[in-house]
Each structure stands twice: as C-alpha cells, then as structure tokens.
C-alpha cells in the first residue's frame, strides 16, 4: 500500500516487509511549460497541479517523440505513466478508425484501471478514446466495447491475447506498443502471452518498455524484439534512486498501517492531494472503509 501527496512525498507500505517507506521525490528546474506540449495537454497537467516533470518524464519526452524504440529503467513512484503517455498523446491525432493505434500492456487489473484513469485525466481536452481490458471481467462486454472503437487500449497480456485470438480485436493498426513493468509481467508468468502478442502486431511500430530492473529475461526480450533501443535510466538497475529520500516505520499489520495513514492524513497542510495504492481490490475496499469512518466523504 502506498500513497503520494502530489509532487512532494510518497509513502510506500510494503506489505511483505511490514515497513512503510517515505519517498520524497525532488524535481529539477525544467517545468512542463518548457516541454513542447499542446495547449490541451498543458491545461490538463496544470489542472492536476503539476508544474515540474520528474526526471524520467523529462528524459523520456523527446526520445519517445523521436519514434525510436525506448527502454526506460525507473522505479515505482517516478511518474512512468506520464513519461510515456505525454509524448505519445502529444503526437496522436484525432482519427475515426475503429481499431486501436496505441497498446499499453501492464501486469495487473489494478494497473490497467490506474493507467486508464491517468490517461483520461490527460485527455480531458483531447478527443481520444481509451479502453481498459483485463481478466476477471466479462469478456463479451469487453468485446462489445472493442467493437465500438478505441484509440488507446490498456490491457493485461492474458486478456489481450484472448481478445486477439477471438478476432474481435485487430492489432495490425498498432503504431506504438508500451510494455510497463515488464519485469513484474515476466515474474507473473506472462512470457508466453507476450511472445504471442508480438506475433499479432505489425512489424512497423515503436516499442516502448519500462522496467524497475534489468533482468536476463527482460534483456532477452529487448534483444529479440527491439531495434537499437534508446535507453533511459534514472538509477542503476535494481538500486534506489539518488533523488529519493526514504524513511521506514515498522507496522505489523494492515490495520496498524491504516491507523498510521489516518494519523498522517490529519496533517491537512502537508497532505492536500493524496493518491493511495494497495495490492488488490479487497485491500482497497478495507482501507476505504477504515478511512471513511474517520474522514467521511473526504476519503
């Protein structure tokens, strides 16, 4: 479980280690005004309260826009979604075509929902369609949504492969493929689906990959399917970022962490905008119920 008050501090509660970690991200001098954003994108960013891109966002912008294959090494909390979506959205024009032009693969249902939500915020003033598909939901409902058309599809590998095999989802129109948290994806056993998804895609496309670590499996995937990728790294593979300050507290169980979170959130001056991340839907429901008792409609 983790939460961030935007542009200041992220607090990560690692359930397996029982330690919450305070992560403070320091931003550089570049502002979003310095990037070549469209007015629509900049207005969305401004409404979200962001002024400075994170290092991975700043470094990725021109590289992704170049159209070359990209491999980014960045850890959780560094703003990876905006790092690849801002340059993609900057150049993605309005189209009436039914089939998607951008495919974003993520390892879990929760990440699909999170990425779709962030894309919808960025495209508030842009006429683009985004659709999320994942396992555990009715596939027939998702087939109907696909048939209505979308510009960007965000998916877990298993469900995307099922939709591709059913011939409902046509992937030959994909111009940009993003694989986010590929190391997690491979750890979860999605290698077979990934390899088969590559076969469904056109050869002429841009490949964009983000990973927290550079493992042998990730490296093999890059060698097999990427063409002279540009590599961006805000830290050495598998090491903490230099611009992150971490402080840990021992919390023995979920309820202790929830109480600690509630205690911290009472500091209204420090925590004005907060994002909370948990490991699964059940945890999200439990945490929401606990915070609702304390904060009411604010939670």
Model features per residue range: what roles?
Residues 1-299:
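Conserved helicase RecA-like core
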């Amino acid at each position: 479980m983790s939460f961030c008050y935007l542009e200041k501090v992220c607090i990560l509660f690692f359930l397996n280690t029982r330690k919450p970690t305070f992560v403070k991200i320091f931003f550089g001098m570049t502002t979003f005004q310095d990037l070549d954003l469209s007015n629509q994108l900049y207005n969305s960013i401004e409404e979200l309260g962001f002024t400075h891109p994170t290092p991975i966002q700043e470094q990725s912008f021109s590289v992704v826009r170049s159209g070359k294959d990209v491999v980014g090494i960045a850890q959780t909390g560094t703003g990876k979604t905006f790092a690849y979506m801002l340059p993609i959205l900057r150049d993605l024009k309005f189209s009436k075509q039914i089939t998607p032009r951008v495919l974003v693969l993520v390892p879990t249902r929760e990440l699909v929902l999170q990425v779709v939500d962030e894309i919808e915020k960025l495209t508030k003033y842009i006429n683009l369609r985004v659709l999320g598909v994942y396992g555990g939901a009715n596939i027939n409902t998702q087939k109907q949504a696909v048939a209505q058309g979308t510009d960007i599809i965000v998916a877990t590998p298993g469900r995307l492969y099922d939709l591709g095999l059913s011939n409902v989802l046509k992937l030959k129109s994909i111009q940009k493929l993003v694989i986010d948290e590929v190391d997690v994806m491979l750890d979860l056993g999605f290698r077979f689906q990934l390899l088969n998804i590559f076969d469904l895609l056109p050869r002429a496309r841009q490949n964009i990959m983000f990973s927290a670590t550079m493992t042998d499996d990730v490296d093999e995937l890059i060698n097999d399917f990427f063409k002279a990728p540009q590599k961006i790294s805000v830290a050495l593979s598998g090491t903490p970022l230099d611009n992150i300050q971490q402080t840990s507290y021992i919390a023995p169980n979920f309820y202790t962490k929830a109480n600690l979170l509630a205690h911290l959130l009472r500091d209204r001056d420090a925590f004005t905008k907060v994002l909370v991340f948990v490991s699964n839907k059940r945890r999200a429901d439990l945490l929401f119920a606990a915070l609702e008792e304390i904060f009411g409609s604010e939670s």
